[in-house]
């Protein structure tokens, strides 16, 4: 079994330090105190220019849970398109509906837009009403490459 050491960071300094200390991959966020938000574009660009290991970018427009309005989804799509333009390794995202079920429609739409980037569903699944049921369904989506829980 291959163990991949992924480090979640919210600064360029932490990303460089993680790489120097043996991280295999970075999950780049902002506001880790809010469980991670989409980082600023400039941080994404600088981190990509300084690191040699794969970078996956958190796509989460606000820290008030995982339910998103259309304006939030538009911001998420814009962030995904930006990440695609920079050839990051992947994006990390997740959506819930108003009843705290994993929103497969929104996730599938975002994952399809993100192609060919890797798409990882994040901790939103932990807040869903049916973690196991959600997991079993989400892994059937061919555009989803993994789940972080």
Question: Each predicted region: which residue ranges?
Answer:
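Glycine-enriched alpha-helix->loop->beta-strand junction motifs that scaffold or abut catalytic
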Residues: 19-26, 51-54, 87-90, 113-117, ...
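Active-site-adjacent beta->alpha loops and helix N-cap segments on the catalytic face
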Residues: 12-16, 32-53, 70-74, 95-115, ...
């Amino acid at each position: 079994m291959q163990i991949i050491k992924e480090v979640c960071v919210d600064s360029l300094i932490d990303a460089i330090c993680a790489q120097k200390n043996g991280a295999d991959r970075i999950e780049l966020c902002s506001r880790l105190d809010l469980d991670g938000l989409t980082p600023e574009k400039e941080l994404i660009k600088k981190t990509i220019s300084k690191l040699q290991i794969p970078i996956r970018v958190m796509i989460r427009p606000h820290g008030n849970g995982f339910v998103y309005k259309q304006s939030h989804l538009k911001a998420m799509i814009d962030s995904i398109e930006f990440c695609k333009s920079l050839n990051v390794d992947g994006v990390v995202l997740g959506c819930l509906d108003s009843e705290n079920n994993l929103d497969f429609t929104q996730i599938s739409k975002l994952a399809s837009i993100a192609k060919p980037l890797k798409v990882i569903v994040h901790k939103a699944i932990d807040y869903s009403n049916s973690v196991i049921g959600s997991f079993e369904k989400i892994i059937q989506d061919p555009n989803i490459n993994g789940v972080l829980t």
